[in-house]
């Protein structure tokens, strides 16, 4: 999360000050850079809040084996931008369900493009709508176990 906040403050927010980043935990909130607390009252409220999101920004973590947050975003038809760290390169189909950036500059670029180009966002979202429900847990489990 520290990496995302750093990229947001340095490379994303200065180029588009109208966009907002919703995050947790609260000690990282910084209204000067449009970083706000995400609402986690209950599951229903959380899903409604997530559905308002235009994109999920998740660089990834080397300790992630699956990243359920990416699958939740996929099923909610929210495009994902990632650096592909950990399992994220397996969760995101580059140019179809989001973008796997090769570096920090690309991460910032793809983030800004999704907010700038409504047709790009619609294309990714339409792809996600078509793919909704296509991942079955028995297949996901087999794929995970095959990596062991």
Please report, for each region that a protein language model flagged, where it lies by residue.
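Conserved acidic donor-binding segment of nucleotide-sugar-dependent glycosyltransferases
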Residues: 94-105, 113-118
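Short glycine-rich donor-binding/catalytic loop of glycosyltransferases
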Residues: 61, 78, 82-89, 103-104
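Acidic donor-binding loop of glycosyltransferase active sites
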Residues: 51-65, 78
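Short alpha-helical segment that forms part of, or immediately flanks, the ligand-binding pocket
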Residues: 47, 70-75, 89-90
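Conserved catalytic-core segment of nucleotide-activated headgroup transferases in glycan assembly
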Residues: 1-36
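A charged, aromatic-enriched C-terminal amphipathic alpha-helix characteristic of glycosyltransferases
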Residues: 102, 119-148
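Conserved active-site histidine-acidic residue motif and adjacent donor-binding/catalytic loop
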Residues: 33-50, 61-63
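Short glycine/acidic-rich beta->alpha loop that forms part of the nucleotide-sugar donor binding site
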Residues: 64-67, 74, 84-85
């Amino acid at each position: 999360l520290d990496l995302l906040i750093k990229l947001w403050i340095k490379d994303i927010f200065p180029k588009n000050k109208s966009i907002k980043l919703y995050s947790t935990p609260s000690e990282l909130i910084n209204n000067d850079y449009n970083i706000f607390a995400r609402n986690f009252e209950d599951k229903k409220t959380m899903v409604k809040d997530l559905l308002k999101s235009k994109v999920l920004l998740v660089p990834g973590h080397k300790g992630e084996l699956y990243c359920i947050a990416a699958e939740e975003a996929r099923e909610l038809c929210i495009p994902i931008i990632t650096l592909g760290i950990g399992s994220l390169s397996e969760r995101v189909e580059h140019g179809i369900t989001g973008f796997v950036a090769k570096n920090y500059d690309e991460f910032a670029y793809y983030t800004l493009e999704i907010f700038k180009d409504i047709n790009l966002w619609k294309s990714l979202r339409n792809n996600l709508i078509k793919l909704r429900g296509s991942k079955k847990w028995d297949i996901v489990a087999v794929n995970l176990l095959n990596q062991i």
